[in-house]
Swiss-Prot record:
NCBIfam families, per the entry: S20
Biological source species: Azobacteroides pseudotrichonymphae genomovar. CFP2
GO terms under cellular component: ribonucleoprotein complex; ribosome
Keywords: Ribonucleoprotein, Ribosomal protein, RNA-binding, rRNA-binding
The keyword Ribosomal protein belongs to this UniProt entry's keyword annotation: yes
Name of this chain's protein: Small ribosomal subunit protein bS20
Amino acid sequence: MANHKSSIKRIRKSQIRRLRNKYYAKTARNAVKNIRGTADKVQAGVLYKKVSKMLDKLAKKNVIHNNKANNLKSKLALYVNSLN
């Protein structure tokens, strides 16, 4: 167990950050699933804009890796464009 005040605080802060990052990452995964489950092109296009913005913000905050965000956006764009 940690002996110093600063290390105890650092552990506490890292746990809070871990839970926050976990929540945002899960929210993003659910949003991606919602797009992939959509068969309507118009609705998928609207959702794509929101999810794209969300992924960029998460990559900027280092919750997910920048390349992962770009790969997800690319795959989702291909999916949305393939809808009729």
